[in-house]
């Protein structure tokens, strides 16, 4: 199983004081040195953490794939086409939310998203949709011809309820049967990672806030190495 490390909240710490530290590139490279297979960043419309220049610095100075999370807007499409990250993950976005609250509703803005997906793929970028573990949304994603699905596993990470893990397991099977690659993300800590890593057909997880918090006491390298050891054991 692969590990994507989201470095958004490294930028959050930096932006709180308007400084140049901590360096998002330095922390990303530490994560890579200790087992991260790719680096994830979410460029929000309000630029509350990662900024445009961070994307280009990461693309230039980090030697693993960049996974750009973004809303399905013309502005973000233009940025993605110029940056040319290896992967783009389309996510829902609300200005008032603290973090992404749910997966995409695939029925909303269907034509707009379909256009953006086709444009990204035309530029050689693999496209992921961030979805709740819903059979209806997975079927819609298949019709949209995306490459991957990232399952929103936040409900399980909060509740640790067996039925939530069963929903994730079933959704991962549906993604696989539809011919798409399945990832998972949102709210994952060490304990959740151990359970999710055992789910068949999930090939990667994205972890951000938890690892940045762990890095404060344990160091980014140690936190990433522990997470990678858990999901590959």
UniProtKB/Swiss-Prot annotation:
Catalytic reaction(s) noted: 3-amino-2-oxopropyl phosphate + 1-deoxy-D-xylulose 5-phosphate = pyridoxine 5'-phosphate + phosphate + 2 H2O + H(+)
Subunit structure: Homooctamer; tetramer of dimers.
Family: Belongs to the PNP synthase family.
Source species: Anaplasma phagocytophilum (strain HZ)
Binding site for 3-amino-2-oxopropyl phosphate: 6, 17, 187, 208-209
Active site, per annotation: 42 (proton acceptor), 69 (proton acceptor), 186 (proton donor)
Protein role: Catalyzes the complicated ring closure reaction between the two acyclic compounds 1-deoxy-D-xylulose-5-phosphate (DXP) and 3-amino-2-oxopropyl phosphate (1-amino-acetone-3-phosphate or AAP) to form pyridoxine 5'-phosphate (PNP) and inorganic phosphate.
Full protein name: Pyridoxine 5'-phosphate synthase
Entry's Gene Ontology BP terms: pyridoxine biosynthetic process
Pathway in which the depicted protein is active: Cofactor biosynthesis; pyridoxine 5'-phosphate biosynthesis; pyridoxine 5'-phosphate from D-erythrose 4-phosphate: step 5/5
Keywords: Cytoplasm, Pyridoxine biosynthesis, Transferase
Cellular component per GO, a single term: cytosol
A single MF term (Gene Ontology): pyridoxine 5'-phosphate synthase activity
Class of this enzyme: transferase
UniProt xrefs under Pfam families: PdxJ
């Amino acid at each position: 199983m692969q590990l994507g490390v989201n470095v958004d909240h490294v930028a959050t710490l930096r932006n709180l004081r308007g400084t140049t530290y901590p360096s998002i590139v330095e922390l990303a490279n530490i994560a890579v040195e200790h087992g991260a297979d790719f680096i994830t960043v979410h460029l929000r419309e309000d630029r509350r953490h990662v900024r445009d220049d961070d994307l280009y610095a990461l693309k230039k100075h980090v030697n693993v794939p960049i996974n750009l999370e973004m809303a399905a807007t013309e502005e973000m499409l233009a940025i993605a086409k110029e940056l040319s990250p290896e992967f783009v993950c389309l996510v829902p976005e609300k200005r008032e939310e603290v973090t992404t609250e749910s997966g995409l509703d695939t029925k909303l803005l269907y034509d707009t998203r379909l256009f953006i997906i086709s444009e990204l793929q035309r530029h050689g970028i693999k496209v992921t949709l961030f979805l709740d573990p819903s059979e209806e949304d997975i079927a819609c994603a298949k019709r949209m011809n995306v490459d991957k699905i990232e399952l929103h596993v936040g409900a399980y990470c909060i509740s640790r309820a067996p039925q939530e893990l069963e929903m994730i397991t079933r959704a991962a099977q549906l993604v696989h049967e539809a011919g798409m690659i399945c990832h998972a993300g949102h709210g994952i800590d060490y304990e959740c990672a151990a359970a999710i890593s055992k789910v068949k057909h999930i090939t990667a997880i994205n972890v951000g806030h938890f690892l940045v918090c762990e890095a404060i006491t344990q160091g980014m390298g140690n936190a990433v190495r522990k997470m990678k050891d858990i999901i590959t054991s």
